[in-house]
Every structure is written in structure tokens, then in C-alpha cells.
A protein has these predicted regions:
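C-terminal beta-signal and adjacent terminal beta-strands/loops
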Residues: 335-342, 367-427
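Surface-exposed extracellular loop regions of Gram-negative outer-membrane beta-barrel proteins
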Residues: 44-66, 93-102, 108, 114-160, ...
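Membrane-embedded beta-barrel scaffold of Gram-negative outer-membrane proteins
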Residues: 49-63, 162, 170, 207-262, ...
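Repeated loop/turn-to-beta-strand initiation elements of outer-membrane beta-barrel proteins
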Residues: 2-3, 44-50, 89-94, 134-137, ...
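Flexible loop and strand-edge segments within Gram-negative outer membrane beta-barrel domains
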Residues: 1-50, 56-74
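Gram-negative outer-membrane beta-barrel transporters
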Residues: 132, 235-242, 262-342
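Transmembrane beta-strands of outer-membrane beta-barrel pores
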Residues: 2-4, 42, 56-60, 89, ...
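Residue-level signature of outer-membrane beta-barrel architecture
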Residues: 40-42, 81-87, 129, 143, ...
Length: 427
């Protein structure tokens, strides 16, 4: 269970809720989960087994954002029956089975109901080929039937190859399909005065929109090395996702509305990451990383960068551990981000097209005392550069006016912070 309240400093929910005295918001969440696992392994054939997984949850969220209400309830049931065995030898393994998913959604947004029941039975088959520890392939296919969207297939392929000792190459690819939950996945946009428009009109489908469908593929290369007789690892990742359909969240057509609609045009993401880990001297580890995140989507015909997503990020970490002492220092570079269009607002409520880039730093030192019942004492600081976004809430002086928008967050919201504490473990 979780309950959160926010808003203006003077906001008092007992007096100001659903009034225009002071702006406030509240989110109350209750969630209950149940699960069970049953399995049987054949005594004479350890490679052969049955498994049955069962789970369910009930999730309820009651929330308000100023004068806007959003209440949602989800009941979920999941069943998965798995049979595992081999084909000839243990180098050829397979898993197959049946699954069943039931989801009941009851959503109420601004007094409009968006209810649906999704029933998705399916079957799957997965084959694994292993050749020693150097090469293996996992190929899978599942076919499901969604009562709202019909049949769909999701193939998947994973290959792992170790051509030489210390070098590992992984390749993967496949297809995915899902139903977007447009309100629950975009709560931040509700903390604004934007008019919400759902442009779909497909009867019998969730919000009148099509499911999201994407193909993705990627490669990962890990290389172990030694430098000055000390071990290290270099890791390179590249992944690409191409959407056949996507529920587009468009906040660019107007600063005073958000449109949800099916993709018409291109949408893709390219993710490249380079990381190096190395013990540069005794007990001192260095980690360096760089990530390129190229994400673009067609918004009303214009192919644009995804808003509020940094294309470039870099990271460096130093970690030292000796005789109970631990020191950790991290510096992060966050590149510039595209800010959604605000040009049809009055001048005082317009934002620049891009955010500035910025650097943040965190540090912590800790000392462990005792062995039988260790006590950790720590001292640290976050955001050492004291860089934070000034005036993150657009039109904060008129929270119930037409230009109010608290969703344009591109940087830290709090300045430099120091903390201290201790951890005591009882074995």
C-alpha cells in the first residue's frame, strides 16, 4: 500500500482537495499479489520435467491532479504450464507449453469509463542447442490469441558464441506485441492543463487504438583483458527497435493538448553503449561508460526526436575498498534534450527548443565496524555540482490556468544534498 500527496507548499488536502484554493495531487495505491509454483522432475531422467506457474494480482489506484481525477483497477490472472525434455541428447533441449492471461481493467478518467477485459491464451515452443560452453542457440516461437486483437506470433532468437577465450558475442532478435495503457504509463502528463485527445476510433479495442508491434535486434560483445597484470572487461552493445505500430504520445501539436494516436510513419530507436571496467591499481576499480540513444518518432507527419530524452550520456565511477573502508565517486554527463513545442503559449510561458547539457556528481564513504554483527557508518552527498532545473513547472503562478504544465522535467529538481547514516545487520 502506498499513499502520496504533493502540490503547492500551502496545499492541505483536508481543505483544498478539488478546490482552486491551492493546487494539489494525490495518488493512493493498493496492490495484492498471490503466486504458486508446482514442479516435477523425472527421477531417472533429470532433463525431463513438468512445471506449472500460477499468479494473480489486484492493483487499485485512486488519484487526482488538481481538479482532474484518474481511478484505475486491474485484476490479473496468469497460468503457465511448461514441459521440458531433450531431442536425442542433452545438447538438444526443448521447452513447450501453454499459457493463459486474463486482465480486467476498469479505468475512470475525468468521469469517462475506459473498461476492458483481455483474455489471451497461447502456446509456445523453445529449442536450445548447446555445443560445449562456447556456442549455444535458443530459438523460440509463441502464438497467442487476444480477444481484442486476434492471433499474433512472437518469434525470438538468441545466439551466444565464444570464438576465443575471453571473448563472448551475443546476438538476439525478435518481435513483440503489447497493449498500451495510455493513462497509467503517462501519469506525468496529467499534472497539467492539457486537453487529452484519443484519436483512434477502432471499435472494441483498448481506447480505440491498435496494439504496439515492434521488431528488435541487437548484439553484445564482451572482451576480457589484462593491463599492467590487472583484469578488466570491455563491453559493447548495439540494439535497434523498429515499430510497425506504436501508440504515439504527441505533446508537440499544441502546448495545451496531448494526442494519443496510432503511428503513421516511422518510429525507431538505436541504442549504442560502450563500457570498460578495470582495476587500475590495487583495490581501486574504474568504470567508464558512454551511451548513444537515438530515438525518433513521426508526430503528425514530422519525424522528431523523442522529447525529454538525452541522445548522449557518459558515466565514470571510481570505487575503492580497503580494510573496511569503501569510497565511491560517480560523475555523469547528461546531454541536451528536445523540449516539446510551447510556441503557442504567451511569451512568458514559452520554453527553449532544447535543454542545456549538465554534469552531476555523487560521492559516498563508509566504514564497516565489527565482524560478527557488522555496523556500517556512511556519509555521502548527491548532486555535488548543485545543478538543478530552475522553474520546472510552467505557469506555476496559475496552476488552474490554461498554460499550467508540470511535465516538462529535463533535469534534477533538487540541489546539493548531504546525508549520513548507519546500517546494522543481524545474522
Amino acid at each position: 500500500n502506498d499513499k502520496r500527496t504533493g502540490g503547492e507548499i500551502d496545499y492541505d488536502p483536508t481543505k483544498d482537495k478539488f478546490t482552486t484554493n491551492h493546487y494539489g495531487l494525490g495518488i493512493t495505491t493498493n496492490r495484492y499479489e498471490e503466486f504458486a509454483k508446482i514442479g516435477y522432475v523425472f527421477p531417472q531422467k533429470k532433463y525431463k520435467s513438468f512445471g506449472w506457474q500460477l499468479s494473480s494480482f489486484q492493483h487499485q489506484q485512486d488519484s487526482y491532479f488538481g481538479l482532474t481525477t484518474y481511478n484505475a483497477k486491474q485484476n490479473n490472472f496468469y497460468s503457465n504450464l511448461i514441459y521440458q525434455s531433450i531431442i536425442g541428447t542433452t545438447a538438444n533441449k526443448f521447452r513447450t507449453g501453454f499459457s493463459f492471461v486474463y486482465d480486467q481493467y476498469k479505468e475512470d478518467f475525468r468521469d469517462v469509463n475506459y473498461n476492458r477485459n483481455e483474455i489471451v491464451p497461447g502456446a509456445f515452443f523453445e529449442y536450445t542447442y548447446s555445443y560445449s560452453d562456447k556456442f549455444n542457440v535458443v530459438a523460440g516461437m509463441r502464438v497467442d490469441h487476444d480477444n481484442l486483437y486476434g492471433f499474433f506470433a512472437t518469434p525470438r532468437l538468441h545466439i551466444r558464441y565464444e570464438p576465443i577465450k575471453g571473448t563472448t558475442v551475443r546476438v538476439s532478435g525478435g518481435r513483440g506485441e503489447r497493449t498500451a495503457n495510455i493513462f497509467a504509463e503517462n501519469l506525468g502528463i496529467l499534472i497539467s492543463s492539457r486537453q487529452v485527445n484519443i484519436i483512434g476510433g477502432v471499435p472494441g479495442k483498448a481506447y480505440g487504438l491498435n496494439p504496439e508491434i515492434a521488431w528488435n535486434e541487437g548484439i553484445n560483445i564482451d572482451q576480457k583483458f589484462k593491463l599492467f597484470k590487472r583484469a578488466g572487461t570491455i563491453s559493447i552493445d548495439y540494439f535497434r527497435t523498429d515499430f510497425q505500430n506504436q501508440v504515439v504520445v504527441d505533446v508537440d501539436k499544441s502546448a495545451r493538448q496531448v494526442d494519443f494516436y496510432n503511428l503513421s510513419g516511422k518510429s525507431y530507436s538505436n541504442s549504442f553503449q560502450f563500457e570498460i571496467d578495470h582495476e587500475i591499481i590495487s583495490k581501486l576499480d574504474l568504470r567508464l561508460a558512454y551511451r548513444l540513444f537515438d530515438v525518433k518518432t513521426a508526430y503528425h507527419g514530422d519525424l522528431l526526436e523523442r522529447p525529454l530524452v538525452a541522445k548522449h550520456r557518459a558515466f565514470a565511477n571510481l570505487a575503492y575498498e580497503q580494510k573496511g573502508w569503501k569510497l565511491d565517486y560517480t560523475i555523469t554527463y547528461n546531454g541536451t534534450k528536445r523540449i516539446p513545442f510551447t510556441g503557442n503559449n504567451p511569451v512568458q510561458y514559452q520554453l527553449p527548443e532544447r535543454s542545456p547539457s549538465y554534469i552531476s556528481m555523487n560521492a559516498q564513504v563508509s566504514k564497516t565496524l565489527g565482524k560478527k554483527h557488522p555496523l556500517d557508518i556512511y556519509l555521502g552527498s548527491e548532486n555535488l555540482t548543485n545543478y538543478y532545473q530552475k522553474n520546472p513547472v510552467l505557469a506555476s503562478d496559475q496552476p488552474f490556468g490554461p498554460y499550467f504544465d508540470a511535465s516538462m522535467v529535463w533535469g534534477p529538481l533538487t540541489g546539493r544534498m548531504f546525508y549520513a547514516g548507519f546500517r546494522y545487520r543481524i545474522k
